[in-house]
Amino acid sequence: MIPTALWRKLGGFDSRYFMYGEEADLCLRAAAMGYLPMITPDAQIMHLGGASAPKGVRMLQNWTSKATLVRGHWPRLLAPVGLSELWLSCATRALAAAMLGKLSGRSNANNDWRMMWEKPSRWHKT
């Protein structure tokens, strides 16, 4: 929950984030203005209706938001470190998924991570 006045002062959600990271960005911007965002662990949200994108699309949106958060909120000199960590994490997961796919005999087991690894420009945008 956020007071309307603060919501307006912050300009609402940043349109660069779609489905992932918008709350983190909003809280980081509020903190930069001296506010103290808090987590309310008992809060619940009920979506009335709705849809879900395929897993690969969700992964791409999530990782794009992570990279956008790093570029937008990390200190300029540290942002390349954060982006490198994301790249390394993606590489590790793609390798692990490929190995598990080979061991299990499921050749399509790593399709989503393979896509993320083969096309980092889609989310990393260096």
Feature roles, as predicted:
Residues 34, 73-77:
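A general structural signal marking secondary-structure boundaries and capping sites
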Residues 1-44:
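A short, conserved alpha-helix in the catalytic core of glycosyltransferases
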Residues 57-65, 76-126:
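Non-catalytic, C-terminal membrane-associated alpha-helical segments of glycosyltransferases
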